[in-house]
Amino acid sequence: MAPVHGDDSLSDSGSFVSSRARREKKSKKGRQEALERLKKAKAGEKYKYEVEDFTGVYEEVDEEQYSKLVQARQDDDWIVDDDGIGYVEDGREIFDDDLEDDALDADEKGKDGKARNKDKRNVKKLAVTKPNNIKSMFIACAGKKTADKAVDLSKDGLLGDILQDLNTETPQITPPPVMILKKKRSIGASPNPFSVHTATAVPSGKIASPVSRKEPPLTPVPLKRAEFAGDDVQVESTEEEQESGAMEFEDGDFDEPMEVEEVDLEPMAAKAWDKESEPAEEVKQEADSGKGTVSYLGSFLPDVSCWDIDQEGDSSFSVQEVQVDSSHLPLVKGADEEQVFHFYWLDAYEDQYNQPGVVFLFGKVWIESAETHVSCCVMVKNIERTLYFLPREMKIDLNTGKETGTPISMKDVYEEFDEKIATKYKIMKFKSKPVEKNYAFEIPDVPEKSEYLEVKYSAEMPQLPQDLKGETFSHVFGTNTSSLELFLMNRKIKGPCWLEVKSPQLLNQPVSWCKVEAMALKPDLVNVIKDVSPPPLVVMAFSMKTMQNAKNHQNEIIAMAALVHHSFALDKAAPKPPFQSHFCVVSKPKDCIFPYAFKEVIEKKNVKVEVAATERTLLGFFLAKVHKIDPDIIVGHNIYGFELEVLLQRINVCKAPHWSKIGRLKRSNMPKLGGRSGFGERNATCGRMICDVEISAKELIRCKSYHLSELVQQILKTERVVIPMENIQNMYSESSQLLYLLEHTWKDAKFILQIMCELNVLPLALQITNIAGNIMSRTLMGGRSERNEFLLLHAFYENNYIVPDKQIFRKPQQKLGDEDEEIDGDTNKYKKGRKKAAYAGGLVLDPKVGFYDKFILLLDFNSLYPSIIQEFNICFTTVQRVASEAQKVTEDGEQEQIPELPDPSLEMGILPREIRKLVERRKQVKQLMKQQDLNPDLILQYDIRQKALKLTANSMYGCLGFSYSRFYAKPLAALVTYKGREILMHTKEMVQKMNLEVIYGDTDSIMINTNSTNLEEVFKLGNKVKSEVNKLYKLLEIDIDGVFKSLLLLKKKKYAALVVEPTSDGNYVTKQELKGLDIVRRDWCDLAKDTGNFVIGQILSDQSRDTIVENIQKRLIEIGENVLNGSVPVSQFEINKALTKDPQDYPDKKSLPHVHVALWINSQGGRKVKAGDTVSYVICQDGSNLTASQRAYAPEQLQKQDNLTIDTQYYLAQQIHPVVARICEPIDGIDAVLIATWLGLDPTQFRVHHYHKDEENDALLGGPAQLTDEEKYRDCERFKCPCPTCGTENIYDNVFDGSGTDMEPSLYRCSNIDCKASPLTFTVQLSNKLIMDIRRFIKKYYDGWLICEEPTCRNRTRHLPLQFSRTGPLCPACMKATLQPEYSDKSLYTQLCFYRYIFDAECALEKLTTDHEKDKLKKQFFTPKVLQDYRKLKNTAEQFLSRSGYSEVNLSKLFAGCAVKS
């Protein structure tokens, strides 16, 4: 019993703390008296207990004084340094047992962890109730549903913790060693702004006392599923409650039921945000006028504050709580007049290890009384394993593998399974029957049609090995088929739809956080309801801010904002506005404090922000809100890559209870996080679909990167400000800055939601899922392989086929032919870092490179590969192939044998039939779109559906050739591409027979040079070609894809063109189209792209050639000057490159700039880059001598580090120059040397590369023989030898020096005029120097350095890589160009020839044009002695040349294979 003290000091600080302090106080007098009593007791003297006289055990006070005392106790944190998260003092006396308010239970739970079940007198109960019983009490203790209580959530310790922290006042800037946090109550504030009791006006200057405990609630309180502790409560909000709803952060009556606060949160939010426009402007002004970080913020503050919400729906929206009776299911009458459970399923989950044979279906159910949909979970049990045993023809001995000659019957298979298999694997009970099944896949020796033994047994019993074989059966199928797959296939469920559950059962104990739960005891009780539109969903978009802890380098979550739409339609256009309510919560890092009077600023601004004292409180609040809002879809950016993992890790570290509220399934153990596949994170959210707009954007649009800022710019056409991670901590210094941080978080959530709506992600995902028949949450994760897999699974199941087991495709590849090894080794066709193609792909015709200024016609086959599959009936079921041959790789790189086309008389196979269905459905939808006066929503719905059908049909071919696909069939894929090549070549030949020139062709399209400038004639010609080609095929169709006014064709898959677009008035406009050029790739900086675009624009223009060259020259000179003088913005230098794997997985991280920048970004926290992400970096001068690739830095590093500057030479030489040089290659009058000169670069370094590319062609054409000596030896190193007399270095590059009459031998005199010595007197030294130089070059050759021919890479290595392309070893750094010898055999041979050439006096004299010159030189200089000296030096070079085999061809060896054996 807590005594009441009249002393003010006691009431101020709390009676309990004060009395305990006195009790522990010790004094000498007290010790002496105690010792004295002990001595007497030992002596046998009786100890008498002295009863003290207590005066005033109970103090009599009036009601007002008592209220003040209770309030003071509530305000006191009596546990030191607890931050209000562990204990709660509710301020009342222990003898208040007769009080009617349920908050008493919260007090008792806070002290001893037990919740008492009190009868509720004076509470009017609704018809739908759950009786009080002992089971309810235990469930309440476990956080489950409790007995019926009127608005009682006070038992939930977590909610008490959250509210306690929300109202904990920020500590002072210089806190004392031991802090005792105290809460102060604002004048005139309601004790709990979200209280269910009607708010009453309180005179200013007085504290509103709590509502009397003995009065019943003013309104009947129906039941509702509890948000935190599982209590069933329902609150009907009133207008008066909403009026009192402004959030008072320094208030908090913690004994109020938390669930009630949650209920009124949304209506309250609407009122608060409705008043926000004016205060928001003040926030902006404060930020602009501040100093330090504020000035930084001021530079990017928006014109209109985010708090200024212009959506009226947000202010008027009110969340209506739904009454749900957990003791009854919302049943409806079925077709047979029986009571059934109807629900719309959205997501499915199974736990194969802990709950085998059970599938959880999550979705929405209609509640008639509330006229709304609520979440539901249906537990489908007893899904049995289904296995198919293929009998052998003859029994075999498993030990020897030989047949015994005994024929097999189905009874023999049954007996072997019963007596051996079932016993061994402890399968106690099973069902079996013989069935007839078809098979059409890649396992050899499996008949097309056969009788199998079908065995069904409980999934709780062990799974059989996948490679199990027996004496009587050769194969067993279905061993690892999941319960979910079996359920979806057998019940023919294709994506989200309405389902009917017959004989639904109530669950004994809640398994999910859904409002309604049901159970189907067997899968046959679940049936599809067709042609009913989907219900609206609850969509929540969220964004969060993290900050890295400097000590442990962990990301801490400091702010979260979310926008919610409670009725988001999937079959209509996105709602406007896309959200109806919202919330925002902020915490502080452990080493920060909130700005002074932050809560008062929020209150003054009337901005609705929850303030959490700790990260644990913030996470608890977020989980509570997720549970309260109960979203079906959570939308974010980079959720799977970063945010979800961080969120779950922080929940785990902070030990926030009920982590599983992030999903819908109740679980205690969090899945393992941080795996490469993100499996744990995906499982954590089961029941709530995750829509990551980054993943969706990657599938639907093309951007240079998929960061939120880039998506906002590309899709929403607006700018997003980025707040650097290191600035966040500084923003806690002032309230205005912290408010801006929250505003930025809120706006990110809004951007994310708008991007999702703009891309129509959800309707498109729903349509694709319904077409493919997979699970929508997986569709939203991207990747088409699984969709194709499920589409084919449904088709083959329906046609009584046994389907390939999951992952069985890996075994044959590893067993047969070593295909994986060869692919990894990449012997032949390695391209762009990918594995070698397992079969030949599409045909690419050799381009006729050049610039075309006449109309070019582009013809294209519509959906070539799907059309070929239909045209020739190519299917698993129709094409005959030998499986063993189909899976082997032929030796010596020979092309694999292509299977024969199926017989035209065969029935259409399943694959072409499925594709035809998709094509026909798309045609029907497009016809529907042409109807007049259609509803815009319907038009959008049709458009999304036809887009989904197109995406699915076009990706169907991919599953054949994708080696990790379940339906991988390389022979079929090879046959399809073979026919594609054949058709393209046939089309080319047909066009050429029509006297037209085909200048290029690629896979499914050809370009025809019309040599015409009349557009009408061009279209006539195109239609003529089209009709001739289409006559040959039934389903294949070629069409005019476009007309180019002018075309710059550079090489295969690289061209630029002006596309003609006819207008309604008969004229046309042109649009620039680029294909495969550097300027459309993201790994070039914007400056290089802009320069390239300008050059292309000039080349494609109608100007004269001289004008074009002049304009390009001016622009390049200007760009070179701008780069050097620093007038180009840093953003123009940013290079973007995608990661093909996680940064830490790269073997050579230093040589790859984007990889080590990615590692730096990951080390900083705030975001995590992974495989598939795009990294931005700039190449800087940092004072080191490292290569350019090792001097890459993130743009934010360049801003922060003063010692970094842009490497201008790199950008001019390795970014701008290569781009322009490649574009201008076919243009006369512009070459690499000229471009280098215009850019201010040294032109000599580009000459080597300019001539290197033509060396091979020159050799074939006899080019070097036609060159002059000067041209032939222009790149050779000159012979240098110092004069032994004066030390001057003499350079020799010819036999002669000077010209005309001044011509003389180069060895005649020293280049130093003052030196009288002649080099001819030092021929021994010259010879020695020559030998040393030759040896140096030979050593350089044998060093074997290889260098990448790609100008932007220039990777240098001595290690010969294992991957080769047709032109040589593939560069391991860039994986797109070949490595060439840095010093080739030709270069060495030419250098040796040069040394012979400069000392070959006889040859030089012979080449003189006139006899007069020859005679003069011979008489004056070339005496026999001089000629002999020259000859000695020449012979020195010739000795080495004679050892070189470069210039010799051994004919006998060359033609050895042609010898005829006698």
UniProtKB/Swiss-Prot annotation:
Return the motif ranges for CysB motif: 1348-1374
Record keywords, A-Z: Acetylation, Cytoplasm, Disease variant, DNA replication, DNA-binding, DNA-directed DNA polymerase, Dwarfism, Host-virus interaction, Intellectual disability, Metal-binding, Nucleotidyltransferase, Nucleus, Phosphoprotein, Transferase, Zinc, Zinc-finger
| UniProt binding sites for Zn(2+) 2 | 1348, 1353, 1371, 1374
Q: Where is this region: DNA-binding?
A: 650-715, 1245-1376
Q: Which reaction does it catalyse?
A: DNA(n) + a 2'-deoxyribonucleoside 5'-triphosphate = DNA(n+1) + diphosphate
**Gene Ontology CC terms:** alpha DNA polymerase:primase complex; chromatin; cytosol; nuclear envelope; nuclear matrix; nucleolus; nucleoplasm; nucleus
Modified positions (Phosphothreonine) in chain numbering? 174, 406
Transmembrane region(s): none
**Which EC numbers characterise this protein's activity in its record?**
2.7.7.7
Q: Which residues carry this modification: Phosphoserine?
A: 186, 190, 209
Sequence segments annotated as region (Disordered): 1-33, 98-123, 232-251
Annotated Zn(2+) 1 binding lies at: 1283, 1286, 1310, 1315
- Keyword Mitochondrion on this protein? no
Domain of life, source organism: Eukaryota
Compositionally biased region (Basic residues): 20-29
PTM annotation? A 165 kDa form is probably produced by proteolytic cleavage at Lys-124.
**Biased composition regions of type Basic and acidic residues, renumbered to the chain:** 106-116
- Mainly localized where? nucleus
Q: Which residues are modified to N6-acetyllysine?
A: 224
Subunit structure, as described in the record: Component of the alpha DNA polymerase complex (also known as the alpha DNA polymerase-primase complex) consisting of four subunits: the catalytic subunit POLA1, the regulatory subunit POLA2, and the primase complex subunits PRIM1 and PRIM2 respectively. Interacts with PARP1; this interaction functions as part of the control of replication fork progression. Interacts with MCM10 and WDHD1; these interactions recruit the polymerase alpha complex to the pre-replicative complex bound to DNA. (Microbial infection) Interacts with SV40 Large T antigen; this interaction allows viral DNA replication.
Belongs to which family?
Answer: Belongs to the DNA polymerase type-B family.
| Function comment | Catalytic subunit of the DNA polymerase alpha complex (also known as the alpha DNA polymerase-primase complex) which plays an essential role in the initiation of DNA synthesis. During the S phase of the cell cycle, the DNA polymerase alpha complex (composed of a catalytic subunit POLA1, a regulatory subunit POLA2 and two primase subunits PRIM1 and PRIM2) is recruited to DNA at the replicative forks via direct interactions with MCM10 and WDHD1. The primase subunit of the polymerase alpha complex initiates DNA synthesis by oligomerising short RNA primers on both leading and lagging strands.
Misc remark: In eukaryotes there are five DNA polymerases: alpha, beta, gamma, delta, and epsilon which are responsible for different reactions of DNA synthesis.
Annotated disease:
Pigmentary disorder, reticulate, with systemic manifestations, X-linked: An X-linked recessive disorder characterized by recurrent infections and sterile inflammation in various organs. Diffuse skin hyperpigmentation with a distinctive reticulate pattern is universally evident by early childhood. This is later followed in many patients by hypohidrosis, corneal inflammation and scarring, enterocolitis that resembles inflammatory bowel disease, and recurrent urethral strictures. Melanin and amyloid deposition is present in the dermis.
Protein name as annotated: DNA polymerase alpha catalytic subunit
What species does this protein belong to? Homo sapiens
